Every structure is written in structure tokens, then in C-alpha cells.
Amino acid sequence: MTVLKLSHWRVLAELADGLPQHVSQLARMADMKPQQLNGFWQQMPAHIRGLLRQHDGYWRLVRPLAVFDAEGLRELGERSGFQTALKHECASSNDEILELARIAPDKAHKTICVTHLQSKGRGRQGRKWSHRLGECLMFSFGWVFDRPQYELGSLSPVAAVACRRALSRLGLDVQIKWPNDLVVGRDKLGGILIETVRTGGKTVAVVGIGINFVLPKEVENAASVQSLFQTASRRGNADAAVLLETLLVELDAVLLQYARDGFAPFVAEYQAANRDHGKAVLLLRDGETVFEGTVKGVDGQGVLHLETAEGKQTVVSGEISLRSDDRPVSVPKRRDSERFLLLDGGNSRLKWAWVENGTFATVGSAPYRDLSPLGAEWAEKADGNVRIVGCAVCGEFKKAQVQEQLARKIEWLPSSAQALGIRNHYRHPEEHGSDRWFNALGSRRFSRNACVVVSCGTAVTVDALTDDGHYLGGTIMPGFHLMKESLAVRTANLNRHAGKRYPFPTTTGNAVASGMMDAVCGSVMMMHGRLKEKTGAGKPVDVIITGGGAAKVAEALPPAFLAENTVRVADNLVIYGLLNMIAAEGREYEHI
């Protein structure tokens, strides 16, 4: 795997904590002269070489690594009650403990093998565990149970509970994806592989754990302890030895209780940490979907309970893998010929969409002074199976104008305390603008992350929605036209055409245009910062922008902000919210 000698491993372990080390000390460890160290360092892997910084006779790495020395590991094991073995390179740490378990099962109990590189590292279902030297904390240990293998089906989730406890003790907020992945939102932090050997009337479970210590640049959708540590505003760097010792202490305590009491005492804790509890998921075998539904929880055996269209299902882990259901919401066919006309009654204009088979057939809009295009479309397209559903903030007079164009009663939907798995934290939901509510509901079609939902219309609203379905509220400010109108009416010298946006405007018109845009962008970025802090754990916070000024706002946001975050312009967001709502009604109808 590498051509590193023992001297390379000693020096690397000395530098792994990221603290400065004098070259004389490093040279003694490498058994060479200090002036030979630079050539010696060039033999390190490329991704390690670039981490070195030299200053005034001291070397340090710009980020810590998960690299150990045998003596330090032995002392750590003694404090934690484990025997230790260090393998700089091996096929698999699980294989090392499995071999020991077959030869001497009692010796395998609480013996831990830590490795830096694995040529055949694997996860559940034989998946390859990808890593580079120093990026991942990888270890395996044995635990002897006086139970047959079939009674240890919940060992995997209980090990995940122990790991999460340890990470929590270090100030890191981590979730569990059934059955045993450690995740931060959509990003995977670590995984657990359990293999068993039955011998002498006892079962030796070999627990293999891999946790990303630093962010692996060659792996997508990954999280790391180091990045979470920095996000949590902890001083200094994460320390791999502290992480490992904390994990061993928690694993020891949890497995002792598990051996005595089973999984039942841990169920509530697991439920609270389960990322997908109450959410839609897909369960796959060999890449094919075998179940889709909503996660209802796990039981005392670690079995997943799922609510599906066909009823309740129970799923053991086995060769099943779980994925969040990110497919766009569509409208189930409740009646073979049912169609919808969806209305978005804004302050200035009415928008509408004809929906057939769960998708927009046509989309239109008109000012309230002339709604004849809506009436013409109704005369052309309507039949006895069209249902009209709308959201309006335009006031009763304009709603009456809309009704005059249509020969069927409109169902105007208000804001509510809860819908589609989203809880509305507005103090008085009946006072909450329904457009803001349906914008939030519609945003779930474009992002399952926490997101800032921005609507640029007569007013600009900037709202916050968490990844776990809490609408937190938001701000309202005048839209671009109202800001310009206010300046024209309330000032003596600013009643002029707005110019263009510039970083440093030098004309009054340009200053007005730039100031208005800066106000909106600043409001968006401030809300994003608040939501980012509240969401925590390095989770992404997206920005979804809708309305007539959406494209201009997205273009005006700073390049650095755009590079670091997902910003998306979504037309007709209110109508998407209505579409999601009637889709949910369709699911309820089908279950009756």
C-alpha cells in the first residue's frame, strides 16, 4: 500500500496532533541528521507532504491526522480497559480480530486493533471503505457474549448509540441513519461493521468502526470530526487519541449494559438520534426499491418499523439499505379524471396553474385590473372534474374578482399550525401570510436541507425552515418598488429613476439601486447566518428564492456566499406548495 518505513510512522505519529515539534527531536526519531529530514519527508504520500509547515526550526502539520504510535496506544488502552494492537498497514482490522477470535476467543474480548491503512477495508454489504492515510480513525475490537448470534441483531444500532454518545461528549452533534451509520444531515461521518464467530458455546462479535477524522477530499457527501469540531467553535484541533479513548469508554459502558439488558434501554435514545424518524425513505436491496414509506421507529430488537401504502412493515437490516426519499412530490390519482386549477393570489398579480397527473399542464398570470385571460382559460379547459384550490394575500375584493371569472367555488387555503410534516412556529398562525406558509411547503420540492425561503414581490419576505421540519418564522421588508416609492414620496432629492447596482455607486440613481439590493441581500445573509448557527453541526443551509426579483437577488449575492452555499431560483413556489398539499391529501385518500 505504501513504502513507508517504521521511521516514517514514528515521525508522522509525533506530528499527528498538529503541534510544533523541533527538528532535532524528529531527527532522533528518524535516526538521521536534521538536514536529512527534508529528503526524508519527500517520501511521504503526496497528500501528507503538503500539510507540513516549517518555522524557526520547528515542524508542524496544518491539520491533525489520525495516526498513532504503539506506546501511546498501549497507554490509552490501559486507561480504557482494552488490550491494543497497532497495524500501520493490514488487509482489514476486522480480519485481524476475527483470526484471533477463532484461535483464542477469550483473548479477542476487549482487544482492539487500530490500523492506518487497509487494503481490503469494508462496510456493510461488502462495500469498500475508501480512505487515505491519516484521514480516518479505523479500529476493530472483539466482545464475547453468552448468547447465540441470532439474539445479537440489535448490536449494530446499540454500537451506533455508543459512538454517538462519545461524539456528543466532545461537543459534536451527530445523528444515526438506520441501522448504524453516523451522519450529519446527508453527509456520512462513519460506519460500523459487525461480524461474528460462534465458538465454545459463546459468540465473539467483532465490531469494526471507521470515522472520518479529517474531511476526505476524494469522497462525496462526507463529514469529518475535524470539520464538526471547528463548526462547534471549539478551541484548537480535534485530537485522534482523545476521540478514540472517548469512544472506547462509551462502547465499554454501553456493551456491558447491552449484554445484561438487551437493546430495550436504548430504544428511546436511538429514536431521538434517528435522522429519518417520521420521514419518507426508500429501502433498497441490490439497488432495487423493496419498500417505500415513513419511518415510525425501531423496536427492542432494533427492527425498523415502516408505514407504507400497503400498511405497516417491519424490516431487519440484513442486505437492506436505507435512503432518504428525495423524489419530487407528485399528486396520486385519487379519481381517474380529477384535475386542479391552483391559484396564487399575490398583492399585485394573480398566478395560476392547471395540474394534470401531478404536473403543471399550463401556467398563467394576469393583473387584477384584467383577469379576462383566466376567464378565457376556464371556458376553454374546465370540465366537471376540476377542483380549484388557492392561496391569497390580495384581500377580499380581489378574491371576489377572481371568483367572478370562475364558475366553481374556490377553496382558499390559510396558514395552519402544521402541514406536510412541517410545524409552524408563528405565534398566531391565522395572522401568518398564507403565501409565506405555502412558499415554505413548496420549498421542500427543491431542498430537504435547512433553507432560507425568500419571496421577492410587493414585499420581500425572508423565512427560516429547519431540516427537521420546523418553520421558525422570518422577516418582512418593503419590496423594491415600495422602497423606491418611499424614497420618492418622503425625500426631496431622491425622486428619480433608480440606476444600476455597483459596488461603489457614484450617482444618486445608482446609489438608490445599490442600496435597495444591498438591503435585501443583507437580510438574506443575516437570516442564513442565524439559521446556520441554529442548525449547527456543519449542516448545509440552502437558499430558495422566488418572485419577480428572484434572479436579480441571486445574481447580487456575494460570489463567496454563492460558492459556499446552494442558492436556487424557484418560480411559482406558492403553487408548488399547493401542489404538495393536494398530493398529501391524495395519499390520505388512498389509505382510507
Curated annotation (Swiss-Prot):
Q: Which reaction does it catalyse?
A: biotin + L-lysyl-[protein] + ATP = N(6)-biotinyl-L-lysyl-[protein] + AMP + diphosphate + H(+); (R)-pantothenate + ATP = (R)-4'-phosphopantothenate + ADP + H(+)
Q: Which family does it belong to?
A: In the N-terminal section; belongs to the biotin--protein ligase family.
Cofactor(s), names only, from the UniProt record: NH4(+); K(+)
Tell me which species this is from. Answer: Neisseria meningitidis serogroup B (strain ATCC BAA-335 / MC58)
Q: Which positions in this protein are listed as binding substrate? A: Y426, G433, S434, D435, R436, T508
Q: Cite the EC number.
A: 6.3.4.15, 2.7.1.33
| Name of the protein in its database record | Bifunctional enzyme BirA/CoaX
Q: Where is this region: Type III pantothenate kinase?
A: 336-592
PROSITE patterns attached to this UniProt entry:
BPL_LPL_CATALYTIC (PS51733)
Recite the lineage of the species. Bacteria, Pseudomonadati, Pseudomonadota, Betaproteobacteria, Neisseriales
Q: Name one Pfam family in it.
A: Pan_kinase
Q: BPL/LPL catalytic domain location, by residue?
A: 83-259
